[in-house]
């Protein structure tokens, strides 16, 4: 009987734990599919990145390298990292911890006959209103880059 009383008495404490908001480190993504040829998508991404005044800092052709190492039919997977130093400075002036969101990173790969383009976005719902405003503007530009590359 005492055991049951202890269990029932602890239920509000246990339930209150589940009511606590969970801190999430999840990064929102924006993804678009296209029927455009893979290499054309990569070229269009490079153009769109440059038109938005970003500079490509790295391009990793992961699928190609895996094929070169013997996996003949391995599909294409690419990552393109890019940055705009003026925007980076603005973001870091707002919050130095935002360095974790840099550089911007787009991934492309093929699946089920389509080319997928995926980019992680900056969180817009943090505690810093200035950073949220900055993130919303950046996310608009990042989506425009992806959409440009995906549009036939």
Regions found by a protein language model. Give the residues of each.
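Compact, glycine-rich, soluble single-domain proteins
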Residues: 51-52, 57-104, 122
């Amino acid at each position: 009987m005492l055991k049951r009383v202890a269990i029932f008495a602890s239920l509000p404490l246990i339930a209150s734990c589940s009511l606590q908001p969970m801190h999430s480190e999840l990064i929102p993504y924006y993804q678009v599919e296209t029927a455009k040829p893979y290499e054309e998508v990569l070229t269009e991404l490079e153009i769109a990145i440059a038109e938005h005044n970003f500079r490509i800092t790295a391009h990793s052709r992961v699928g190609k390298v895996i094929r070169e190492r013997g996996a003949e039919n391995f599909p294409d997977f690419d990552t393109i990292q890019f940055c705009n130093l003026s925007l980076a400075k603005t973001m870091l002036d707002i919050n130095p911890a935002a360095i974790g969101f840099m550089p911007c990173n787009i991934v492309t790969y093929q699946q089920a006959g389509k080319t997928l383009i995926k980019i992680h976005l900056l969180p817009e719902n943090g505690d810093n209103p200035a950073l949220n405003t900055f993130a919303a503007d950046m996310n608009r530009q990042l989506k425009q880059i992806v959409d440009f590359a995906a549009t036939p």
